[in-house]
């Protein structure tokens, strides 16, 4: 009887230990999967950096700017096709953060709600969504706040591209751009994502 009780106690102890180990392994597996997914999303976003739809300015035909990642006004996002050469934002850029400095580019952007680890880098990625939309009221409603990049396919348009949140501004045309063949060019929603280390 004493031997049976001793064996039963050993089996109960073994089952409890296996159950605890299994729970810890499941938690560790969840953390690994979360990390893997975060890296996948980050890699996909960085790979899209600089994708501005069908637009390619050509070699040496563009001036690059670095607007604030907090900028929300379409006119200040770094796109300007009225200049020669045209102006576009940097696709991917990094800048340091140093809490002891007040120099431009070394301070935390005003729109960041999370804390940024001191003396670390902030990576900003800019691109348009890979899926374009037709310029219609259903896709870009009145009062829209998302900036859209529209690229002209028509040699008769005075601008090669236009950035706006207002559907009425998106008037550039596709290839067959005269007479009955004239159709509005599609537009791409614009995205700016910032990555940083949080303490």
Predicted regions and their residues:
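N-terminal pilin/flagellin-like segments and related low-complexity appendage regions
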Residues: 38-199
């Amino acid at each position: 009887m004493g031997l049976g009780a001793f064996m039963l106690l050993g089996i109960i102890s073994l089952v409890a230990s296996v159950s605890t180990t299994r729970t810890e392994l499941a938690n560790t597996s969840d953390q690994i999967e979360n990390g893997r997914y975060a890296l996948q999303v980050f890699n996909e976003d960085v790979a899209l950096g600089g994708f501005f739809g069908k637009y390619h300015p050509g070699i040496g035909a563009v001036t690059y700017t670095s607007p604030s990642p907090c900028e929300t006004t379409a006119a200040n996002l770094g796109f300007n096709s009225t200049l020669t050469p045209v102006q576009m934002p940097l696709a991917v850029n990094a800048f340091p953060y140093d809490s002891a400095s007040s120099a431009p580019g070394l301070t935390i952007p005003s729109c960041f709600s999370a804390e940024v680890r001191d003396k670390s880098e902030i990576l900003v990625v800019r691109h348009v969504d890979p899926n374009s939309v037709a310029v219609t009221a259903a896709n870009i409603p009145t009062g829209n706040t998302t900036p859209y990049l529209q690229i002209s396919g028509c040699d008769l348009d005075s601008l090669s591209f236009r950035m706006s949140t207002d559907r009425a501004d998106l008037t550039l045309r596709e290839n067959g751009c005269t007479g009955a063949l004239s159709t509005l060019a599609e537009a791409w929603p614009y995205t700016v994502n910032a990555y940083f280390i949080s303490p």
